[in-house]
Amino acid sequence: MNSLLRCCLIKPINIKNTTSFINKLNPKSIIQKSNNYNNINKNILNKFKDSSSNYFINSNKILEICNNNNNNNKYNVNKRNYSSSSNSGNNNNNNYNNKNNNNNNESFYKKFENSFEIKRIKDILFIIVGTFVIFKIYDNKIGIVFCENEIDKETILNDPYDKIPNEIIVELKDSAKDDNIIEESDEDDGIKKISSFKLFFKTIGNDIWLFGFGIITAFFSSWVGLQIPKVFGVLIDCTKNGDSLQGPAIQAIFILLAQAGLNFLYSTMISVACERYSARLRSTLFGAMLEQEIGFFDQNSTGDLINRLSSDVQLVRSALKHSVSLGVKSFGQIVGGVISLILISPKLSLGMMTILPTMVSVGTFYAGWLKSLSVRSQRAQAQSTIVAEEAIGNIRTVQAFSNQHYESERFIEKNQHSLALSTESGVQIGIFQGVTSLALNSVSLLVYWYGGTLVSRGEMTGGQLTSFIIHTMNMQSSFSQLSILFTQIMSAMGGMQRITELINRVPLINSNQGFKLRELKGEIKFINVDFKYPTRPHVHVLNGLNLTLKPGQVVALAGSSGGGKSTIAGLLERFYDISNGDITIDGYSIKQLNAKWLRSRIGIVSQEPSLFATTILENLRYGNPNATEDEIIEAAKLANAHQFISNFPKGYETIVGERGVQLSGGQKQRIAIARAILKNPQIIILDEATSALDSQSELLVQTALDNLMKGRTTLVIAHRLSTVQNADLIGVLSHGKIAEFGNHNELMNHKGLYYKLVQRQLSQQQQ
């Protein structure tokens, strides 16, 4: 069960002359029960009734709650020890009296004075323990907290939830019983750290059976292949002894046919399983990318992320396929070959085995080095991919500035670094394979020399030596395949490490947590908001911002470029979490609300709308996938887009091109407005929606925007101040705060920052 605490000072209280009181008390927030018991959930308080002293948490008890911003804004009990004189009637020595206060302030102080009369240590312990239990049971999320360092020193502003003069009250509001809350979810979206090994089994799913049967079939193929050298040895001995060759020849034919069939089966099963696995892995990785917060994409380039989806997954798929199809068979041939060699000639086998420890040691030494080198090479390759993606994605800009040579040089520079690392990796692989080949050839020479010696002594037959040599050659081939496969596996492990890191990354903003509201009115409040971008942690974009938008109100933001206007729009959609303060919608903190649900209730039209390289119809349906054709046409008409769409030869089936390049700016804007209308949001954000249009297009777009804004809370961000004159209220941003706030006429008469901005733009237009 969750509960929401709201602490509010109902009447503005002048505390200009109470510096000593503030310095003495220095509260971050004081939450105290009113004498009006109807404002308190009595059932909650009765649970913590002290039966021995018959005390309640009431006006004689203080609950001090600290808003800890470093702990996800959850409340913690601040264990301060407030005490007063043992004589409750003696108020002469009370440090909070101020002779200069008027009668109203004296009455205010007496209430605080009486509140701190805690006579016994038992009462203090009762307060601390009781408060801790309350907030443990009710798992408080966030409330409106007055902190001394976050409010005006002279005036504490009221919050109009309950109209009781001069009272500080607590409202314990059980969110689970709130009729406006229709769903609450604490799901973590299954985002848990998982090893690469577990990720494999989770991703391959039911295809693990197909994968397993493929492995078993590969082992059978290896076992069948081990019979071939034995049959060839028998054929040689039969020739020498004059025996019939028909039986061994037929046996050899059946063995070869069986091996071919088994090779087909295991290769097909493993290939199908690996292709399905790579498709699921790519989907899982892409899903993990989409769940990340916007700050993650600010810190990671598009090219690098695309490289993980393509190159890294391809490396893993290829290595997995070859490691099973070739690796399992080669491993089976090596193990079976060793057993067969021992059965044929223990002496010759013992001599050959002396070199195997050297081969294993060399392979182990190179394993870690090749893996780290592979990771570095893949990252360098990703950098060259980034340059290529940027250049091709902005090819019109590149060609407009005739910078093809410059972009080519950038790509060559990044590619050279990737080439150097790839070359180093190739050299190391060559060394490894050369050493492996030397070891295997040494084994072959040993077999030929010592085997011939044993045949001359009569300890082996010619057929046995032939069988032994064929087994040795098969083992040599298997070792060569494993050495090549080993380097592929090391590269794949580097790619898998990058994939697993991203899948395991827990987004800083979980879009699936929080509750949804049955009805969204659209009241928005920014309360003492501080914000810094993750990529610029030392730059304060917003600093103590306070802003209120009432339901259905149109509020415009003006100010110089880079002042934080678009940042406010991003924070409202919770693309980022604020550093300090709070943002509330209909009285609920934005951190409590389900982010996906919230964004589905917000429509945005930006200066450069993002359209997908598909049809106009599909772009419109992005606002509402379930919209009917009639609803789409009606939305297009309201956005003044239906006429120009109908004039296209293919109408709504017209392809708009990548990012809508085949449409004009005004056409893209009107499609974006129609898309927002289909979304039917309660809150609208217009981020410089008409600043890049000509006067004729602006008139059409502005008419469409007027249709969109009807009855909806609207936040308008504009550089051209002529577009915001009709707004209900205008806020002027300066140094991360609202410096001026009012309608157009009020701000012009004030002749402050807004007046200067208007005059500056008028003079620029005249010039």
Curated annotation (Swiss-Prot):
**CDD domains found in the cross-reference section:** ABC_6TM_ABCB8_like, ABC_MTABC3_MDL1_MDL2
Query: Does Metal-binding count among this protein's keywords?
Result: no
Q: A GO molecular function for this record? A: ATP hydrolysis activity
Q: How does it sit in the membrane?
A: Multi-pass membrane protein
Q: Which InterPro entries match?
A: AAA+_ATPase, ABC1_TM_dom, ABC1_TM_sf, ABC_transporter-like_ATP-bd, ABC_transporter-like_CS, P-loop_NTPase, Type_1_exporter
Taking the first listed entry, what is the main subcellular location of this protein, grouped into a coarse class? membrane
In the record, biological process GO terms are: oligopeptide export from mitochondrion; sorocarp morphogenesis
Q: Where is the ABC transmembrane type-1 domain?
A: 211-491
Q: Where, by residue number, does ATP bind?
A: 559-566
* Superkingdom: Eukaryota
Family matches, as SUPFAM superfamilies: ABC transporter transmembrane region, P-loop containing nucleoside triphosphate hydrolases
Query: Single GO cellular component annotation?
Result: ATP-binding cassette (ABC) transporter complex
| Region of interest: Disordered | 81-104
UniProt KW DNA damage keyword: no
Family matches, as Pfam families: ABC_membrane, ABC_tran
Report the transmembrane regions from the record: 208-228, 252-272, 324-344, 350-370, 429-449
Ranges for domain ABC transporter come to 524-760
Sorted alphabetically, the keyword list is: ATP-binding, Membrane, Nucleotide-binding, Transmembrane, Transmembrane helix, Transport
Subcellular location(s) per record: Membrane
Family membership: Belongs to the ABC transporter superfamily. ABCB family. Multidrug resistance exporter (TC 3.A.1.201) subfamily.
Protein's name in the database: ABC transporter B family member 4
Q: What is the lineage of its organism?
A: Eukaryota, Amoebozoa, Evosea, Eumycetozoa, Dictyostelia
